Amino acid sequence: MDPLGPAKPQWSWRCCLTTLLFQLLMAVCFFSYLRVSQDDPTVYPNGSRFPDSTGTPAHSIPLILLWTWPFNKPIALPRCSEMVPGTADCNITADRKVYPQADAVIVHHREVMYNPSAQLPRSPRRQGQRWIWFSMESPSHCWQLKAMDGYFNLTMSYRSDSDIFTPYGWLEPWSGQPAHPPLNLSAKTELVAWAVSNWGPNSARVRYYQSLQAHLKVDVYGRSHKPLPQGTMMETLSRYKFYLAFENSLHPDYITEKLWRNALEAWAVPVVLGPSRSNYERFLPPDAFIHVDDFQSPKDLARYLQELDKDHARYLSYFRWRETLRPRSFSWALAFCKACWKLQEESRYQTRGIAAWFT
């Protein structure tokens, strides 16, 4: 029996060593897998770079990260329920430290389009986190759209078919009697104005202007033209009967502040060059603007504007819509609140192909 005595401790020592080595091997495999999964973006069966999810917010009040400030210009962020009473709130921040916990990330295209692989948020991405692609620029000024495919769940732009529609302006009914007094025609001492920052000599709008000004005097403000200090813009433009709301590129729904602010807030009749008349009429009454397509040539348009200048009744007919409607303008803060409300209205979690859609 003595030879059997030491055998038992020897077996136990070997068993413990084997178990320890096995556990160590499993730990090494696990951490190796974890590191690879963090360094390499995964493409899931749904064809995207993130897993299927219901998109349910991780917080009772959704946390939204602004990946960049639009055009790198910070703005004040009032509570959404203060902007529009009775609406829901979100915690909206530009602090990237909250990225791992954020329920949604808003990415403004302009700041990431130069080098998307380096400028977009990095992995790992929290499951259920929704990314919102945001742009107020036209496709002509949005580069590398293809690089955005497969990342985003929602779109936000001036396009009416966006998931989150953020137009440059809109009309809404007066809640009571119109607050504005009737138009003071005697204050309209000038005829036609145009404020332009990016001249673009070969652009459609500059070519049209050059033909128009051969038949009609147009006062041009902006870079390389008459100075127009920002604080005096509305005061200056309000002296004009007409304003050339010429867009820098022609795309569906691309109707910008050139109409909503420069023309309508100055109580000037907008003369528009942009998408089709029918597209404008989705957002404005047909007698609220003059479209260049209504005339065979710039010369014919010039003649019409000169006729309206002499016919007060016909000119004033372009303001009848103001008896029941008033113009409102876009703000960045309101756009972010629209994203907040959309996230709480539905939990849809899909991938959007940006390049094929935004044309």
Curated annotation (Swiss-Prot):
Listed transmembrane segments: 15-34
Residues on Cytoplasmic side: 1-14
GO biological process terms on file: ceramide metabolic process; glycosphingolipid biosynthetic process; L-fucose catabolic process; N-glycan fucosylation; oligosaccharide biosynthetic process; oocyte axis specification; protein glycosylation; protein N-linked glycosylation
GO cellular component entries: extracellular exosome; extracellular region; Golgi apparatus; Golgi cisterna membrane; Golgi membrane; methylosome
Pfam family, one: Glyco_tran_10_N
Compartments (UniProt record): Golgi apparatus, Golgi stack membrane; Golgi apparatus; Secreted
Major localization class: Golgi
Listed EC numbers: 2.4.1.152
Glycan attachment residues as annotated in the record: 46, 91, 153, 184
Pathway(s) it belongs to: Protein modification; protein glycosylation
UniProt tissue specificity: Kidney, liver, colon, small intestine, bladder, uterus and salivary gland.
Enzymatic reactions: a beta-D-galactosyl-(1->4)-N-acetyl-beta-D-glucosaminyl derivative + GDP-beta-L-fucose = a beta-D-galactosyl-(1->4)-[alpha-L-fucosyl-(1->3)]-N-acetyl-beta-D-glucosaminyl derivative + GDP + H(+); an N-acetyl-alpha-neuraminyl-(2->3)-beta-D-galactosyl-(1->4)-N-acetyl-beta-D-glucosaminyl derivative + GDP-beta-L-fucose = an alpha-Neu5Ac-(2->3)-beta-D-Gal-(1->4)-[alpha-L-Fuc-(1->3)]-beta-D-GlcNAc derivative + GDP + H(+); an alpha-Neu5Ac-(2->3)-beta-D-Gal-(1->4)-beta-D-GlcNAc-(1->3)-beta-D-Gal-(1->4)-[alpha-L-Fuc-(1->3)]-beta-D-GlcNAc derivative + GDP-beta-L-fucose = an alpha-Neu5Ac-(2->3)-beta-D-Gal-(1->4)-[alpha-L-Fuc-(1->3)]-beta-D-GlcNAc-(1->3)-beta-D-Gal-(1->4)-[alpha-L-Fuc-(1->3)]-beta-D-GlcNAc derivative + GDP + H(+); a neolactoside nLc6Cer + GDP-beta-L-fucose = beta-D-Gal-(1->4)-[alpha-L-Fuc-(1->3)]-beta-D-GlcNAc-(1->3)-beta-D-Gal-(1->4)-beta-D-GlcNAc-(1->3)-beta-D-Gal-(1->4)-beta-D-Glc-(1<->1')-Cer + GDP + H(+)
Membrane topology (Lumenal): 35-359
Record key words, sorted: Glycoprotein, Glycosyltransferase, Golgi apparatus, Lipid metabolism, Membrane, Secreted, Signal-anchor, Transferase, Transmembrane, Transmembrane helix
Highest taxon of source: Eukaryota
Entry comment on modification after translation: N-glycosylated. Proteolytic cleavage releases a secreted glycoform of 43 kDa.
Effect on the protein upon substituting residue 73 to T: Loss of site-specific fucosylation leading to generation of approximately equal amounts of VIM2 and sialyl-lewis x. Reverse the site-specific fucosylation pattern leading to generation of VIM2 predominantly instead of sialyl-lewis x
Gene3D superfamilies: Glycosyl transferase family 10, C-terminal domain (3.40.50.11660)
A GO molecular function held by the record: 4-galactosyl-N-acetylglucosaminide 3-alpha-L-fucosyltransferase activity
Chain residue ranges for the region called determines site-specific fucosylation: 73-112
SUBUNIT field: Homodimer and monomer. Monomer (secreted form).
Family of the protein in this entry: Belongs to the glycosyltransferase 10 family.
PANTHER family: 4-GALACTOSYL-N-ACETYLGLUCOSAMINIDE 3-ALPHA-L-FUCOSYLTRANSFERASE FUT6, ALPHA- 1,3 -FUCOSYLTRANSFERASE
Protein name from the UniProt record: 4-galactosyl-N-acetylglucosaminide 3-alpha-L-fucosyltransferase FUT6
Organism listed in the record: Homo sapiens (Human)
